[in-house]
């Protein structure tokens, strides 16, 4: 394994410390949050440029086809996402194994409507098969949903399978009438991203969207 001496976050990890999990309708038993994920060896954080070596792409392959992405391609896409400021890929790490075990992406869409508001999309949600039952599905979705609110999104949208509608309803999402399996959660409208989300070198960023949400667990 290549030894990496310097690591870069996709966005400012301090944003996650601001999230108030008591604002979510999710029912955690026991209560957990991004700051306290339930186990001392778990850490919720932004994606790092070194996560290529922590199995991030292998985890995504449990969700959908990833392809043969080499290190250079990974780092190039990471840099593009960071530079754009509109991608907030968030992961859960098992620090005992130095392995990524959960992930979800918030993609920011900039609008002219609603006074040039910003909207969030929840995408690429996945939890390692062997870690089911630890509420990690709820944890990663609620983390990214609260992050969207923190960043000033007026709403967050997702697409899901039939069997996951109840799961997302339990987290505050509602089905969009006449729009198949699209769901949304609305926040107080905010016209722009908060300044701390786009501050120097610590923000996430824009690019093309990937696969939408597809979870295969019920917790």
Swiss-Prot record:
Presence of keyword Acyltransferase: yes
Q: Which GO terms describe its molecular function?
A: glucosamine 6-phosphate N-acetyltransferase activity
InterPro entries in the cross-refs: Acyl_CoA_acyltransferase (IPR016181), GNAT_dom (IPR000182), GNPNAT1-like (IPR039143)
Pfam families the record matches: Acetyltransf_1
Q: What is its EC number?
A: 2.3.1.4
Q: Cite the N-acetyltransferase domain residue spans from the record.
A: 42-198
Q: Which GO terms describe its cellular component?
A: cytoplasm
> Which processes are annotated in GO (biological process)?
UDP-N-acetylglucosamine biosynthetic process
Where on this chain does substrate bind? 64, 111-114, 123-125, 154-155, 186
Q: In which pathway does it act?
A: Nucleotide-sugar biosynthesis; UDP-N-acetyl-alpha-D-glucosamine biosynthesis; N-acetyl-alpha-D-glucosamine 1-phosphate from alpha-D-glucosamine 6-phosphate (route I): step 1/2
SUPFAM superfamilies named among the record's database cross-references: Acyl-CoA N-acyltransferases (Nat)
Signal peptide start-end: none
Sequence positions that bind acetyl-CoA: 133-138
* Keyword set includes Transferase: yes
The record's section on CDD domains has: NAT_SF
Which keywords accompany this UniProt record?
Acyltransferase, Transferase
Reaction catalysis annotation: D-glucosamine 6-phosphate + acetyl-CoA = N-acetyl-D-glucosamine 6-phosphate + CoA + H(+)
Please give the family membership noted in the entry: Belongs to the acetyltransferase family. GNA1 subfamily.
Recorded protein name is Probable glucosamine 6-phosphate N-acetyltransferase
Q: Which organism is it from?
A: Drosophila melanogaster (Fruit fly)
């Amino acid at each position: 394994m290549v030894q990496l001496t310097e690591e870069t976050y996709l966005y400012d990890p301090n944003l996650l410390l601001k999230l108030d999990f008591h604002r979510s309708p999710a029912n955690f038993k026991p209560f957990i949050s991004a700051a306290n994920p339930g186990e001392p060896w778990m850490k919720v954080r932004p994606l790092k440029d070194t996560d290529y070596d922590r199995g991030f792409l292998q985890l995504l392959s449990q969700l959908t086809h990833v392809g043969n992405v080499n290190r250079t391609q990974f780092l190039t896409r990471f840099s593009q996402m960071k530079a754009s400021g509109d991608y907030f890929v968030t992961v859960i790490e098992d620090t005992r194994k130095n392995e990524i075990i959960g992930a979800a992406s918030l993609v920011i869409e900039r609008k002219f409507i609603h006074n040039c508001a910003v909207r969030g999309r929840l995408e690429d949600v996945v939890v390692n098969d062997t870690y089911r039952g630890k509420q990690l599905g709820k944890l990663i979705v609620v983390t990214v949903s609260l992050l969207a609110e923190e960043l000033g999104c007026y709403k967050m949208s997702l697409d899901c399978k039939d069997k996951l509608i109840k799961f997302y309803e339990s987290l505050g999402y509602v089905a969009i009438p006449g729009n198949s399996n699209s769901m949304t959660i609305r926040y107080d409208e905010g016209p722009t991203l908060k300044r701390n989300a786009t501050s120097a070198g610590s923000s996430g960023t824009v690019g093309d969207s990937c696969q939408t949400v597809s979870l295969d667990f019920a917790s």
